[in-house]
Amino acid sequence: MDYLIIIRITAVAVVLYLTRYVCCLYLHLQDVPGPLFAKFTNLQRVWWVKSGRAHEYHRRMHAVYGPAVRFGPNMVSISDPRTIPAIYPSRPGFPKSDFYRTQKPYTPNKGAMPAVFNSQDEDLHKRLRSPIAPLYSMTNVVKLESFVDQTLAVLLEQLDGRFLGSNDVPFDLGSWLQYFAFDSMGTLTFSRRYGFLEQGRDMNGILGEIWKFMKRVSVMGQIPWFDEFCNTNPFIALFRSPTGFGVLKVVDKFILQRLAPREKDEVSDEKDMLSQFLNIQASNPDVMPWAPRAWTFSNIMAGSDSTANVMRTIMYNLLVHRDTLSRLQDELLESESSNGLSRTCPSWEKVRDLPYLDACVLEALRLHPPFCLPFERVVPGGGLTVCETYLPAGTIVGISPYMANRDKETFGNDADEWRPERWLGLSHEDRKRLENSLLTFGAGRRTCLGKNIAILEIKKLIPVLLLNYDIQIVNPENYKTENAWFFKQTGLQAVIRKRAKMERGSSNKDKPTLPPVLNIPPSSSTVDVRVIDPGTLLDLRPDLFWQPELPGLRKVTAPTYCFLISVGTRHVLFDLGVRQDWERLPPSVVAMIKSQTTIQNPRNISDILDSDASSLGIRSTDIEAIIWSHAHFDHIGDPSTFPLSTELVVGPGIRDSHWPGFPTNPDAINLNSDIQGRKVREISFERTEKEAIKIGSFDALDYFGDGSFYLLNAAGHSIGHIGALARVTTSPDSFVFMGGDSCHHAGVLRPSKYLPCPSHSRHIPLSSESESVFTLSPVLPSDYDAALKTVDNIKELDAYDNVFLILAHDSTLKGNMDFYPLTINDWKAKGYGKQTKWLFYKDLEDAMEGTK
């Protein structure tokens, strides 16, 4: 009976203990939202990591629960990059969690070895980091540049010998980037390559060993107490190699080789990092004897794979997003011709400050950080409040670089997309803000030491590849990623061909100038654009609109395009064309029309919408606003045919200069009925306006407030003249520009210094292959200088192959693109931009033929 009592008491005690333990776990962070299981166990974290898609699970959790989410009984994940300084301060006090304990390489005879990146003890970390930190400064790294140059030469030799002339047989470009990164680090560290490039394979199984290490520690890091049983256990080590053992064997081999002559008092002339490590240890009694081993291990583990990761990210995205590839190649060619950039051995001095290369590197670091689980820290005494959430002392807290780097409040709604331009044209403060929001290299006291080495290698490699080879990606759908702490990519297959060398100076005069960066704010929102051709035709006198005159081009019969812009159930019209009863316009306007032009087939846009027999179903009653590009008769249509609830939007100065209208003002060119009973909104491009921004050289206004549709200040042709820019696709972005009457012939815009005459059109005699055929005539513009500036601004837009430019009276587009009720959102996929850009040369050919 006594035994039964003891058993019962013991059972009750165990139950009470477990209940208290579970309650403490739950209550410890009870105010932090998260999935139910996370309050009691870390097993779901293990599953997330084991799946290889932990970053996706993390993102879903934050989407559901907010910026602070409980991932485990004592672990909280934060997604807001604005909290980086609080969690990763420059001062001591936020040690790394036991997640990093599992990353210490282990051997049975020497135990677990701390290194700079995995040490939890902050005093030990300081003792390991401080002696070698100067070696990783850019000043010192540049002294080792010749080691990288040697490896670049071997890479070129191997690519030329193995893959050129191979009948476009695909090869694993991703693996060769990794071979280059490892052999570069080998030369930097040991003055010798591992042999990856020469052999074209994983030497000594190092790559496989590192990936095995990552897959093991990523899981163990979620339940670090289990590591002592499964990995750092002398008994287990009898049956399998512990994590990091293979890499340590390579490290020990090279160190022993380097120490041998030193033990014989032989002088070594090696200038690599291992020599510097050994010199530091030999000259500083406070440095632990095993420190060079730890430093070298870090170089191999963290310094090579992560660099290769960024290289793969850059090349994949450049090859998929060919517009960014072209832009970077243009920048490199410009630097080659003007600054002496070498194709085979570019110096750091020549590549360090190339703006678009820099933007591509930053975008790769942002989009695909090499390490992709939360960087865990332990909250010190006194606790921490982040995201309005209090975390008591002892709580494990961390931010994943994947979450911080894709924060949409910081990087824009297109934070998931490749867009290097987001880094260009920023103020110093905005650029710093974005850079400080990146967690790729860590932050605070534990920022990655090898950052400068990685940047130097990357900025030297990418120009070499792009200047020497035409590279095409093969089956991009096979490109995959797997997250095992290290965010690995596979499947980057490509074919290469030798790129023809442009002789320096031979084509500079014909070489296009890079247009200014447009700095269109990122957005994931788009509009549908439908171009309405009402069938109305106007006869234009060229001398009123452009100069010089061509004897055979005395008259141009032009259409009048209008635009239906839709986002969801919201619909606006940009311009209305010529009203059907145009003879009811003010007498002075009617007289001008009859003396200078003829109008064929005028139609009201409201009638076109209301008679549409397609399934579109957008009627005049659905239009929330009419936007006038300007107040001339061939654009204003008849607003009175729309409900009074339809707003009229006009450019700056229109309201005061055009109303009262006719008949109140006999000299007016607009009618009172245009606005009678209707709300008129006159937009302003003043920077004090909330939605006012700058796009390229244009002052702009975000019309819907979501980055899908902008009005641009296209001044000069008349008072209040505006254009519009619509985002019609994302991933990648493409746009439609509606130019109104900024000019009336594409020859006013093309060729340009950004867009020279194509070779197939050079049989037409031109004064210059990089200057427009025509210039604006000064006859009609209300402000000729402003009109010329607007044309220059449009030329900048026109130079981008993701902007489709439509002038209101461009006859070359008729029959060469889709019109209402179809959208033109797929204009780029259908090739409208390339197919129509130079069709205006037909006018010139016809004009010259007519003079013969």
From Swiss-Prot:
Keywords: Endoplasmic reticulum, Heme, Iron, Membrane, Metal-binding, Monooxygenase, Oxidoreductase, Transmembrane, Transmembrane helix. Pfam families: Lactamase_B, p450. SUPFAM superfamilies: Cytochrome P450, Metallo-hydrolase/oxidoreductase. One of its GO terms (cellular component) is endoplasmic reticulum membrane. CDD domains: CYP57A1-like (cd11060), metallo-hydrolase-like_MBL-fold (cd07730). The chain crosses the membrane at residues 7-29. It is found in: Endoplasmic reticulum membrane. Disruption phenotype: Results in dramatic reduction in MPA production and leads to the accumulation of 5-MOA. It catalyses: 5-methylorsellinate + reduced [NADPH--hemoprotein reductase] + O2 = 4,6-dihydroxy-2-(hydroxymethyl)-3-methylbenzoate + oxidized [NADPH--hemoprotein reductase] + H2O + H(+); 4,6-dihydroxy-2-(hydroxymethyl)-3-methylbenzoate + H(+) = 5,7-dihydroxy-4-methylphthalide + H2O. This is Cytochrome P450 monooxygenase mpaDE. One of its GO terms (molecular function) is oxidoreductase activity, acting on paired donors, with incorporation or reduction of molecular oxygen. Its main location: endoplasmic reticulum. It is an enzyme of class 1 (oxidoreductase). GO terms for biological process: mycophenolic acid biosynthetic process; terpenoid biosynthetic process. Residues 1-6 are lumenal. Its EC number is 1.-.-.-. Gene3D superfamilies: Cytochrome P450 (1.10.630.10), Ribonuclease Z/Hydroxyacylglutathione hydrolase-like (3.60.15.10). It is a single-pass membrane protein. Pathway: Secondary metabolite biosynthesis; terpenoid biosynthesis. Its cofactor is heme. Residues 30-852 are cytoplasmic. Belongs to the cytochrome P450 family. InterPro entries: Cyt_P450, Cyt_P450_CS, Cyt_P450_E_grp-IV, Cyt_P450_sf, Cytochrome_P450_monoxygenase, Metallo-B-lactamas, RibonucZ/Hydroxyglut_hydro. Heme binds at residue 448.
